Amino acid sequence: MGALSSRVLRPAGRTEQPEPTPGAGGAARRSDAGEDAGHSFCYCPGGRKRKRSSGTFCYCHPDSETDDDEDEGDEQQRLLNTPRRKKLKSTSKYIYQTLFLNGENSDIKICALGEEWSLHKIYLCQSGYFSSMFSGSWKESSMNIIELEIPDQNIDIEALQVAFGSLYRDDVLIKPSRVVAILAAACMLQLDGLIQQCGETMKETISVRTVCGYYTSAGTYGLDSVKKKCLEWLLNNLMTHQSVELFKELSINVMKQLIGSSNLFVMQVEMDVYTALKKWMFLQLVPSWNGSLKQLLTETDVWFSKWKKDFEGTTFLETEQGKPFAPVFRHLRLQYIISDLASARIIEQDSLVPSEWLAAVYKQQWLAMLRAEQDSEVGPQEINKEELEGNSMRCGRKLAKDGEYCWRWTGFNFGFDLLVTYTNRYIIFKRNTLNQPCSGSVSLQPRRSIAFRLRLASFDSSGKLICSRATGYQILTLEKDQEQVVMNLDSRLLIFPLYICCNFLYISPEKRTESNRHPENPGH
């Protein structure tokens, strides 16, 4: 129902005129009766005070009478065109109060969850649920009292109150804490407008406290756009804003999607993804743990160390307790973990990942290294999106404030020592060969290519994306010690802290036949 109100906008530059008063227009009138009653005086500059008739004729200026008449006419015209604002009582509010809250002239009663609502069929027909009920051959179409069965445990009395009330008013205020219950009621009653409003409320209020509940509810009630938005939030925040509370709530199925995605906003390197998974698995197994994020890794390592002593010779993911988590760990890109010596040692010592998984990846990387050294491998020459999505190196960096930064990500990258610089709003890639020290071997080939994608993002306090830039997948060919600007940032879009995430592919994918493809192998 639309609220009735009258609102007319004034022309620009025009102010509301005051009500006309006696003597307006510049003529001064005496308030006392006497010989001057009905007359006025002229106070023209340089002239004597002269008595004037009620016609306000000025002998100093014979044309003044005509001017005054014209001014008075203009004034009246202005008054006629000056809007007057008068707020009318809202029809919508009247209907909501009188018909819904007071139940006046009700022709049907709806009973549910021990509560009763005195409503009106003509309003209920806005609901697809009741429209079908009243227009068909259902026995309820002729009943004055209808008992509703509520099979959905998310629906409560308050949610039904909001859902029924939405039929009698234009706008509904929805609290984020109540949106799931209201959505459930709206879906049951087939209230499309309310369902849409619930969806918008959910998308606007995604946070660490709401994201998992919203994701589950969006899947239950078919809000694909909300589900997609929640997944995007998780991809952006899982690693950048780690949370004990979030780790506890994330299900195995959701975590599998996140870890398998090339859009996961990784901070540092793939080893940090493994560490996050280890902490998440501990909290899934010990949900009663209530320490801080700083304490979490230490407690996690202690817990798994105790387990390791009891199950010597068996990796955790091979046990009955660990098997449910194996599908998530399979999505780790282990080739970028074992390429760093310190990380390789940790993953061996933890005894979480089956040795067969690691053996397959060691073999794969050894053969790739031989190709790079002996087969004139110069890197990817074309965009292979499938390979980039599934096997690219994921890494990132947080820039706390504006300034100059230069860094490299650790690990063996087939002789391509990539230096990344941020300075003066530019991001620069440099292929280092001889100019700067490098801990590993460096390829001296004249040219080397890499496939990459660069993404930048800033987030507000709730983890919502407030600005972002991305390059898309590209091929970059660099000569020895050559550097290249890969992104120039608009200072207006720079909001710190700034998060940088990259995907890299340093060598072209090996041509594999169907016979040697192994989907269960995490290295492929």
From Swiss-Prot:
SUPFAM superfamilies per the UniProt record, alphabetical: POZ domain
Biased composition (Acidic residues): 65-74
Chain positions of motif Nuclear localization signal: 47-53, 83-89
Domain named BTB: residues: 106-176
GO biological process: germ cell development; regulation of DNA-templated transcription; spermatogenesis
GO terms for cellular component: nuclear envelope; nuclear matrix
Tissue: Ubiquitously expressed at low levels throughout development and in adult tissues.
Gene: Gmcl1
Keyword tags: Developmental protein, Differentiation, Nucleus, Phosphoprotein, Spermatogenesis
Subcellular locations according to the entry: Nucleus matrix
SMART domains named in the record: BACK (SM00875), BTB (SM00225)
Protein function: Possible function in spermatogenesis. Enhances the degradation of MDM2 and increases the amount of p53 probably by modulating the nucleocytoplasmic transport.
Name by which UniProt lists this protein: Germ cell-less protein-like 1
Chain positions found as Phosphoserine: 64
Species annotation: Mus musculus
Main location: nucleus
